[in-house]
Amino acid sequence: MKQPSLIYLTGFSGSGKSTIGPLLANSLGYDFVDLDQQIEHLAGKTINRIFTEEGEAHFRDLELMVLQNYSGKSELVVSLGGGLLQNDRCFSLIISTGTLVYLHSNPLVLAKRLSHKSDRPLMKGEDGQRLSRDAIEQKILNMLEQREPRYKTAQITVETDTKRIGTTVEELTRKIERYIRRCEKKQLERNTKQRKQ
């Protein structure tokens, strides 16, 4: 059953999911889980190592397994990996169980934010060498072209480019609370209609 208070945060790497997620959970009075951290804990290794040693297919299986642990919960904010929605099974599970929130950022802003993080696979080419800023921007644009259609299925979208984090969290809190109230009202109307039949 769909739980509007099960919040899935999505967005490209560098959009602010790991920073905003715990603050949003605190603002809503919910728990917080970073799915990538849970996968690393389960596997006993970093996501980079999982990809390198066991391949993407194994990582996607782990992703689904960990996601399923949280899909029946409520009052929970789950930070998703930037590419998770490309996993069809994960995408279907998310759409059917909770509320998807998209943290949108301009590709140039993402490139600037990510250029300071050397541990991200996105920052490296196939040869393992660090990419130039232009190459990072192009890589982001190419990946967004693939990911954006699923990001845009989110019930709630917030821009994270220029706002302060606190302002973004306040805006998200208002939008989520409003969305949950609308969902509850629709459910109440459906229940009332069914009882009358």
Swiss-Prot record:
<keyword id="KW-0067">ATP-binding</keyword>
<dbReference type="GO" id="GO:0009423">
    <property type="term" value="P:chorismate biosynthetic process"/>
</dbReference>
<feature type="binding site">
    <location>
        <position position="18"/>
    </location>
    <ligand>
        <name>Mg(2+)</name>
    </ligand>
</feature>
<dbReference type="InterPro" id="IPR027417">
    <property type="entry name" value="P-loop_NTPase"/>
</dbReference>
<keyword id="KW-0547">Nucleotide-binding</keyword>
<feature type="binding site">
    <location>
        <position position="147"/>
    </location>
    <ligand>
        <name>substrate</name>
    </ligand>
</feature>
<feature type="binding site">
    <location>
        <position position="82"/>
    </location>
    <ligand>
        <name>substrate</name>
    </ligand>
</feature>
<dbReference type="GO" id="GO:0004765">
    <property type="term" value="F:shikimate kinase activity"/>
</dbReference>
<keyword id="KW-0460">Magnesium</keyword>
<comment type="similarity">
    <text>Belongs to the shikimate kinase family.</text>
</comment>
<keyword id="KW-0808">Transferase</keyword>
<feature type="binding site">
    <location>
        <position position="60"/>
    </location>
    <ligand>
        <name>substrate</name>
    </ligand>
</feature>
<protein>
    <recommendedName>
        <fullName>Shikimate kinase</fullName>
        <ecNumber>2.7.1.71</ecNumber>
    </recommendedName>
</protein>
<dbReference type="InterPro" id="IPR031322">
    <property type="entry name" value="Shikimate/glucono_kinase"/>
</dbReference>
<keyword id="KW-0479">Metal-binding</keyword>
<comment type="pathway">
    <text>Metabolic intermediate biosynthesis; chorismate biosynthesis; chorismate from D-erythrose 4-phosphate and phosphoenolpyruvate: step 5/7.</text>
</comment>
<comment type="subunit">
    <text>Monomer.</text>
</comment>
<keyword id="KW-0963">Cytoplasm</keyword>
<keyword id="KW-0028">Amino-acid biosynthesis</keyword>
<dbReference type="GO" id="GO:0005829">
    <property type="term" value="C:cytosol"/>
</dbReference>
<keyword id="KW-0057">Aromatic amino acid biosynthesis</keyword>
<feature type="binding site">
    <location>
        <position position="120"/>
    </location>
    <ligand>
        <name>ATP</name>
    </ligand>
</feature>
<dbReference type="GO" id="GO:0008652">
    <property type="term" value="P:amino acid biosynthetic process"/>
</dbReference>
<feature type="binding site">
    <location>
        <begin position="14"/>
        <end position="19"/>
    </location>
    <ligand>
        <name>ATP</name>
    </ligand>
</feature>
<dbReference type="GO" id="GO:0000287">
    <property type="term" value="F:magnesium ion binding"/>
</dbReference>
<feature type="binding site">
    <location>
        <position position="36"/>
    </location>
    <ligand>
        <name>substrate</name>
    </ligand>
</feature>
<comment type="function">
    <text>Catalyzes the specific phosphorylation of the 3-hydroxyl group of shikimic acid using ATP as a cosubstrate.</text>
</comment>
<dbReference type="GO" id="GO:0005524">
    <property type="term" value="F:ATP binding"/>
</dbReference>
<keyword id="KW-0418">Kinase</keyword>
<dbReference type="InterPro" id="IPR000623">
    <property type="entry name" value="Shikimate_kinase/TSH1"/>
</dbReference>
<dbReference type="Pfam" id="PF01202">
    <property type="entry name" value="SKI"/>
</dbReference>
<dbReference type="InterPro" id="IPR023000">
    <property type="entry name" value="Shikimate_kinase_CS"/>
</dbReference>
<dbReference type="GO" id="GO:0009073">
    <property type="term" value="P:aromatic amino acid family biosynthetic process"/>
</dbReference>
